[in-house]
């Protein structure tokens, strides 16, 4: 566990050039920058100019690009700065294992699994923005956090909301949790209209500012599907205790229902910096200059049930939870492959869920993972099966 909540925090950011990573650095600078945080390492992928600029600005000790072919470019960009440079999978592991009490795990996709697991095993407090650690690895990741002795602080706005309102001494009285979903840009579109949308249209989220892949996952509601599986592991819930409601305003971030009929919710303007600030300052709250809710101007809050015909990702998540085994890894691997194909224009929007369902059908009954090798094997089989369908 990180030492001393009042001391300067030593932090590594895995995925600093993505949407969550850049927002994390913005929060750090608003909370005092180098006066309150020491940055042990930053990692990125292909945006070398941004990674180098971030490392210089925040005074990082180590900068890592996941792309081994870009090592020389990053080294040149940081020449004379005194900042160490590394690349590839070994570089990501080096960043994760570097002495830092806190780690922001914001690498998108399965690429974030290995380094985040390495950080958890050494006992770092993990601010978790990577969904795949829980969707694919599930209890293996939770066990690694417990064995390492660190804390797990969710950064997804929905899970962060639940974490904030969940009364730890009353967990036995939790009846259900309700994850809210904006409905994305296609909430009111017909199936026929959705059949012809492009990636550029799908990425335009009505409320949140996010990266390309996460925005499209939100449009298909696969983002919410992954969050359902995450919530099961994070809060040790049964599948039937997890509900989803569409809430177009994205003001209520999630709710916890108790056995006495009470429902507690966390509200706020849609800004990821709120959840990031809460995680980085935990157990205290920080002072952030984000927009405040104006209830008079807001006037109303709307809720509606998700349409699982137009958005079948929800039922696929429920199926993955009920079947157990490595179906979370199968769902995610197939989804990532289908998503990449959609972005490249090789398949239509609705084909993503169709491919995932067929892959889950074909790989049903795989045993539960007993090691990360089992997780990676299931993921690879799902990706291969999806790729065969796309070819």
Curated annotation (Swiss-Prot):
<dbReference type="InterPro" id="IPR013644">
    <property type="entry name" value="DXP_reductoisomerase_C"/>
</dbReference>
<feature type="binding site">
    <location>
        <position position="223"/>
    </location>
    <ligand>
        <name>1-deoxy-D-xylulose 5-phosphate</name>
    </ligand>
</feature>
<dbReference type="GO" id="GO:0030145">
    <property type="term" value="F:manganese ion binding"/>
</dbReference>
<dbReference type="Pfam" id="PF13288">
    <property type="entry name" value="DXPR_C"/>
</dbReference>
<feature type="binding site">
    <location>
        <position position="211"/>
    </location>
    <ligand>
        <name>NADPH</name>
    </ligand>
</feature>
<dbReference type="GO" id="GO:0030604">
    <property type="term" value="F:1-deoxy-D-xylulose-5-phosphate reductoisomerase activity"/>
</dbReference>
<protein>
    <recommendedName>
        <fullName>1-deoxy-D-xylulose 5-phosphate reductoisomerase</fullName>
        <ecNumber>1.1.1.267</ecNumber>
    </recommendedName>
</protein>
<feature type="binding site">
    <location>
        <position position="205"/>
    </location>
    <ligand>
        <name>1-deoxy-D-xylulose 5-phosphate</name>
    </ligand>
</feature>
<feature type="binding site">
    <location>
        <position position="130"/>
    </location>
    <ligand>
        <name>NADPH</name>
    </ligand>
</feature>
<feature type="binding site">
    <location>
        <position position="18"/>
    </location>
    <ligand>
        <name>NADPH</name>
    </ligand>
</feature>
<keyword id="KW-0464">Manganese</keyword>
<dbReference type="Pfam" id="PF08436">
    <property type="entry name" value="DXP_redisom_C"/>
</dbReference>
<keyword id="KW-0521">NADP</keyword>
<comment type="pathway">
    <text>Isoprenoid biosynthesis; isopentenyl diphosphate biosynthesis via DXP pathway; isopentenyl diphosphate from 1-deoxy-D-xylulose 5-phosphate: step 1/6.</text>
</comment>
<comment type="function">
    <text>Catalyzes the NADPH-dependent rearrangement and reduction of 1-deoxy-D-xylulose-5-phosphate (DXP) to 2-C-methyl-D-erythritol 4-phosphate (MEP).</text>
</comment>
<feature type="binding site">
    <location>
        <position position="131"/>
    </location>
    <ligand>
        <name>1-deoxy-D-xylulose 5-phosphate</name>
    </ligand>
</feature>
<feature type="binding site">
    <location>
        <position position="132"/>
    </location>
    <ligand>
        <name>NADPH</name>
    </ligand>
</feature>
<keyword id="KW-0560">Oxidoreductase</keyword>
<dbReference type="Pfam" id="PF02670">
    <property type="entry name" value="DXP_reductoisom"/>
</dbReference>
<keyword id="KW-0479">Metal-binding</keyword>
<dbReference type="GO" id="GO:0051484">
    <property type="term" value="P:isopentenyl diphosphate biosynthetic process, methylerythritol 4-phosphate pathway involved in terpenoid biosynthetic process"/>
</dbReference>
<keyword id="KW-0414">Isoprene biosynthesis</keyword>
<dbReference type="GO" id="GO:0070402">
    <property type="term" value="F:NADPH binding"/>
</dbReference>
<feature type="binding site">
    <location>
        <position position="182"/>
    </location>
    <ligand>
        <name>1-deoxy-D-xylulose 5-phosphate</name>
    </ligand>
</feature>
<feature type="binding site">
    <location>
        <position position="157"/>
    </location>
    <ligand>
        <name>1-deoxy-D-xylulose 5-phosphate</name>
    </ligand>
</feature>
<feature type="binding site">
    <location>
        <position position="156"/>
    </location>
    <ligand>
        <name>Mn(2+)</name>
    </ligand>
</feature>
<feature type="binding site">
    <location>
        <position position="227"/>
    </location>
    <ligand>
        <name>Mn(2+)</name>
    </ligand>
</feature>
<feature type="binding site">
    <location>
        <position position="19"/>
    </location>
    <ligand>
        <name>NADPH</name>
    </ligand>
</feature>
<feature type="binding site">
    <location>
        <position position="17"/>
    </location>
    <ligand>
        <name>NADPH</name>
    </ligand>
</feature>
<dbReference type="InterPro" id="IPR026877">
    <property type="entry name" value="DXPR_C"/>
</dbReference>
<dbReference type="InterPro" id="IPR036291">
    <property type="entry name" value="NAD(P)-bd_dom_sf"/>
</dbReference>
<feature type="binding site">
    <location>
        <position position="227"/>
    </location>
    <ligand>
        <name>1-deoxy-D-xylulose 5-phosphate</name>
    </ligand>
</feature>
<dbReference type="InterPro" id="IPR013512">
    <property type="entry name" value="DXP_reductoisomerase_N"/>
</dbReference>
<feature type="binding site">
    <location>
        <position position="47"/>
    </location>
    <ligand>
        <name>NADPH</name>
    </ligand>
</feature>
<feature type="binding site">
    <location>
        <position position="20"/>
    </location>
    <ligand>
        <name>NADPH</name>
    </ligand>
</feature>
<feature type="binding site">
    <location>
        <position position="158"/>
    </location>
    <ligand>
        <name>Mn(2+)</name>
    </ligand>
</feature>
<feature type="binding site">
    <location>
        <position position="224"/>
    </location>
    <ligand>
        <name>1-deoxy-D-xylulose 5-phosphate</name>
    </ligand>
</feature>
<comment type="similarity">
    <text>Belongs to the DXR family.</text>
</comment>
<dbReference type="InterPro" id="IPR036169">
    <property type="entry name" value="DXPR_C_sf"/>
</dbReference>
<dbReference type="InterPro" id="IPR003821">
    <property type="entry name" value="DXP_reductoisomerase"/>
</dbReference>
<feature type="binding site">
    <location>
        <position position="158"/>
    </location>
    <ligand>
        <name>1-deoxy-D-xylulose 5-phosphate</name>
    </ligand>
</feature>
<feature type="binding site">
    <location>
        <position position="218"/>
    </location>
    <ligand>
        <name>1-deoxy-D-xylulose 5-phosphate</name>
    </ligand>
</feature>
